[in-house]
Regions:
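Generic structural marker for isolated residues within well-ordered, non-membrane alpha-helices
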Residues: 100, 114, 356, 411, ...
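Extended, non-catalytic structural segments that build the interaction scaffolds
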Residues: 43-61, 327-362, 379-405, 428-465, ...
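Short coil/turn segments at secondary-structure boundaries
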Residues: 115-117, 131-132, 290-301, 369-375, ...
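Extended, charged amphipathic alpha-helical segments
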Residues: 226-387, 434-438, 442
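Extended, helix-rich architectural segments
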Residues: 1-171, 491-493
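Extended, regular secondary-structure scaffolds
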Residues: 115, 120-123, 127-266
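Short acidic alpha-helical/loop segments enriched in Asp/Glu that coordinate divalent cations
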Residues: 364-379, 409-431
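Extended, compositionally biased alpha-helical segments that mediate assembly or anchoring
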Residues: 478-493
Length: 493
């Protein structure tokens, strides 16, 4: 990703025009300015960070404000708190549980998903969607952020049809790849897909078919001029046979107050932009204070060597040295004089601390999450602040509830598509996500406490269900097996 944002990928206008001619209204048009703004804050770009000023002589010069990228830090913190390798999908059938978690592990899904969550919490929306390799008969998951996601059909219950736009490369040239995940009631005809040649029996390339309710993945490619391409090996329309969405939309549990009724989400720092500015403003002021307070050394003219330069006898300079050594012209007194300005960092640090507290409070972490530790001088860890931070715990649960539906949706779609390729996967039944809260909770202590309760207020199978994610029948069987083995081992002594 380019540091200046010039090379970042955004949906090209010819792709938007193609979707409009198919009859779709694009909610991206209203949200894109906000998404671009949030993207700039995450990358510390824009007029706040790079601007021009004038000196006393009226000369214009460029100024760059230093940044610790607070907006990105907020998003990364949420990503690390919500998703890691210990997060598991738990199905009603244990074999389905084992299969889907093995799939996620082998495809490194959770690591990539954490990055998706980081971008989604920063830009307001993200997604993961099925990607089918028919040649290898493999199912994979592709990850997208708000720049590449275009909802096509939605209501209060969520997004039911969606398009994803990415850059791909075909024969050494970049192409724009549009993939539409359309519900079974809408059949896409590749012959009439071109908006320039509509067919009378199709409504702009789409035909209602009430008899089918499965999802189809429609792929269209364009060159940089907007001309449609037909790359070898790309199937224009693929019926997944899946009756539920073949994608999952990732959004933070934050109400979108920027565009009313939009299917897009809102950035977690959308209402904290002033706090982001305050953090970087105080950080830059702190660095400037230290830089301007460096010791200055003034040396008498007699300490400098001289050399002949034509008809002139010039002083040999020491070098720039960041403007810390100065020459006193025509001076022989006090050959070496030091000047050390007093540091005012205590006030700067206090302002920086207040800005961090405000940022944490406005982004859902609570006022103490980014607070600075007096003994160590930097921010505390999540575990240190979570014990007395009810705001953080409440918001974690809200975001987990929002994220669970997206993970379950893509997990079910993966299992359904894999069955069509011959994978023996039982029906998953009721499915939920077991999140890992060990980062913010003392999980070891909780497990130990539950272990003490086994045989008193909790059965061994209940312990296994909670801590090993096993379905009830498996947990009961394994608990009984372990108990029998213990009895047999004891009787043999």
């Amino acid at each position: 990703m380019s540091t200046n944002g010039l090379d970042e990928y955004w949906v090209p206008e010819h792709v938007k025009d193609y979707l409009r001619k198919l009859g779709f209204v694009l909610p991206l048009d209203d949200m894109e300015p906000w998404i671009r703004s949030w993207d700039d804050w995450m990358s510390a770009r824009g007029d706040f960070y790079d601007y021009r000023d004038k000196d006393g002589m009226g000369r214009v010069y460029a100024v760059h404000r230093r940044s610790i990228h607070p907006a990105m830090r907020v998003c990364k913190e949420w990503g690390s708190l919500l998703l890691n390798e210990e997060v598991k999908v738990v199905c009603e059938d244990q074999k389905a549980t084992d299969w889907i978690n093995s799939f996620f592990s082998s495809t490194n899904f959770m690591n990539a998903a954490q990055t998706t969550v980081v971008r989604a919490f920063g830009l307001g929306t993200g997604a993961w969607a099925l990607w089918i390799d028919l040649g290898k008969r493999k199912v994979r998951i592709r990850h997208y952020d708000a720049r590449m996601v275009i909802p096509l059909s939605w209501d209060e219950d969520g997004i039911t049809e969606c398009a994803f736009v990415t850059r791909a490369f075909y024969r050494g040239k970049s192409v724009d790849q549009l993939q539409m995940h359309l519900k079974g009631g809408m059949v896409f005809s590749p012959d009439s897909s071109s908006p320039s040649t509509p067919s009378p029996e199709y409504a702009e390339g789409l035909l209602t078919n009430e008899s089918e309710e499965t999802y189809r993945i429609v792929t269209v490619c364009f060159d940089h001029e907007g001309n449609e391409l037909a790359p070898v090996g790309i199937l224009p329309v693929y019926d997944t046979g899946c009756p539920f969405p073949t994608f999952g939309i990732v959004k933070p549990a934050v109400t979108n107050t920027r565009v009313d009724m939009s299917p897009y989400g809102q950035s977690v720092f959308a209402d904290a932009v002033d706090a982001v500015q305050a953090v970087d403003l105080t950080f830059d002021a702190l660095i400037n204070e230290i830089d301007l307070s460096k010791m200055r050394v003034f040396l008498s003219d007699v300490l400098f060597d001289r050399e002949q330069d034509g008809n002139k006898n010039v002083t040999i300079p020491f070098g720039k040295q960041d403007c810390t050594v100065f020459r006193k012209v025509m001076s022989t007194e006090d050959t070496i004089q030091e000047f050390a300005p007093a540091l005012r960092t205590s006030g700067q640090i206090e302002a920086f601390r207040v800005a961090l507290q405000m940022l944490g409070d406005l982004t859902g972490f609570g006022i103490n999450y980014f607070d600075m530790d007096d003994s160590r001088g930097y921010v505390k860890t999540a575990t240190e602040v979570s014990s007395d931070n009810s705001a953080l715990m409440r918001n974690i649960r809200r975001h987990e509830n929002s994220l669970e539906g997206s993970i379950v949706s893509i997990a079910r779609a993966v299992m359904h598509a894999s069955r069509s390729f011959g994978e023996s996967i039982p029906d998953e039944g009721e499915t939920h996500v077991q999140f890992d809260d060990s980062i913010i909770q003392d999980t070891a202590a909780e497990k130990e406490q539950d272990m003490r309760e086994v045989g008193v207020t909790m059965g061994a199978w209940e312990y296994r269900m909670r801590w090993y994610g096993e379905e009830e029948s498996v947990a009961r069987a394994r608990a009984a097996e372990i108990g029998t083995s213990s009895v047999s081992g004891g009787s043999g002594k």
